[in-house]
């Protein structure tokens, strides 16, 4: 049975005006687990996290709106690779010719979750327009972009292929909704 401790603190600033909304939060957290053999930081332990959100309404009848969200987070823990070795299976028992046999790739790991991935950050933005067709029908159109400056945030590292796998690239999107 594992046990653990999670502790942290948040600082929040918020402004809400007629046209402008601003929200900023900083979170400091520390999570540790103990599996009976060792204490370690789990893979979701993010020490520092900053979110900044702003929304602004403008235009005739405030029918236009822009939204921006920026997020910065310290890297998650991961277990580093110390090295590789050939892991022979000895499938023929004592008769296995280890001089010509091809083994599987074995990985030598460092201590559990002692490494940290690089910091994560991205900017998402959108602009939307609301069109009131009549008293009962409204059309909302939105254009948005996720990861606006195309930050290459790491998702994980493929140890076998020795290849970095990133999270979302820049992703534009468009949408519309009709309410009645």
Predicted regions and their residues:
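Gram-negative outer-membrane beta-barrel transporters
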Residues: 1-77
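C-terminal beta-signal and adjacent terminal beta-strands/loops
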Residues: 71-104, 116-124, 128-180
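Extracellular loop and loop/strand-boundary signature of outer-membrane beta-barrel proteins
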Residues: 8, 34-41, 110-114, 159-164
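Sequence-level detector for tyrosine residue identity
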Residues: 15, 21, 26, 40, ...
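Short, surface-exposed alpha-helical recognition segments that flank or form part
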Residues: 1, 114-115
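Short glycine/proline-rich turn/loop motifs
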Residues: 104-110
């Amino acid at each position: 049975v594992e046990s653990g401790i999670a502790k942290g603190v948040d600082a929040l600033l918020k402004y809400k005006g007629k046209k402008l909304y601003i929200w900023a939060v900083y979170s400091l957290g520390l999570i540790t687990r103990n599996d009976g053999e060792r204490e370690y930081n789990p893979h979701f332990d993010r020490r520092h996290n900053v979110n900044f959100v702003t929304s602004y309404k403008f235009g005739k009848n405030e029918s236009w709106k822009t939204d921006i969200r920026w997020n910065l987070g310290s890297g998650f823990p991961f277990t580093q690779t110390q090295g590789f070795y050939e892991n022979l299976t000895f499938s023929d028992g004592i008769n296995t010719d280890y001089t010509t046999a091809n083994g599987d790739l074995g990985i030598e790991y460092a201590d559990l979750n002692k490494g940290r991935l690089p910091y994560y950050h991205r900017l998402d933005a959108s602009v939307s327009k609301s069109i009131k067709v009549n008293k009962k029908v409204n059309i909302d159109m939105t254009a948005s972009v996720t990861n606006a400056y195309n930050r290459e945030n790491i998702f994980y590292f493929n140890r076998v292929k020795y290849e970095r796998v990133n999270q979302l690239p820049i992703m534009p999107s468009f949408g519309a909704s009709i309410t009645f």
